[in-house]
Amino acid sequence: MVRLQKAVMAVGMFSIFEAILQDRLGSANGFEKAKHILKDSSNFSLLQKLEDYKNAINALKHGKGRSYEYLVGRQPNLDFRIKLPHEIHFNEGDVSEVTILVDVDDNFVMGCARVIEEVSSVLRTEQPHILI
């Protein structure tokens, strides 16, 4: 149950952040607009982290698909664990584990929060007229 609660929290955080980006950046796709701002300001490392976490959230919401395949290709470079196609469990015998493709532990939830805060900070610097 704890892992499921963490997954719901992470998905909720990113969903609310996306809604805020859409509203404040005046864009139907807030993440794309934010990614352009990160790229234009040469924040490539943060851009990559945003893309990784955005795809992880999509894999949590939708299961296997493009976002999951993206994560499988990036697996050695991710800040969090994903369940690889040949894996059944993250930790066999862990009764708190739920059937999801991303290991949503404290590290993952805090990573989501850090990415949101860091992206917000860059947006406030690059677009000072926007309140995020």
Task: Give the location of each predicted region.
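Short, solvent-exposed segments of well-ordered alpha helices
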Residues: 1-8, 44-47, 51, 103-106
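Charged, amphipathic alpha-helical oligomerization/scaffolding segments
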Residues: 16, 49-52, 59, 111-114, ...
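Residue-level signal for well-ordered alpha-helical segments
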Residues: 1-2, 27-30, 37, 89, ...
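Short, contiguous, well-structured surface segments enriched in hydrophobic/aromatic residues
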Residues: 1-31
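Short gly/ser/thr-rich secondary-structure transition/capping motifs
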Residues: 38-43
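Short acidic alpha-helical/loop segments enriched in Asp/Glu that coordinate divalent cations
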Residues: 22-37, 67-74
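Histidine-centered, metal-coordinating catalytic motifs and their short helical/loop contexts
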Residues: 44-72
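Polyanionic, low-complexity intrinsically disordered segments
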Residues: 66, 70-132
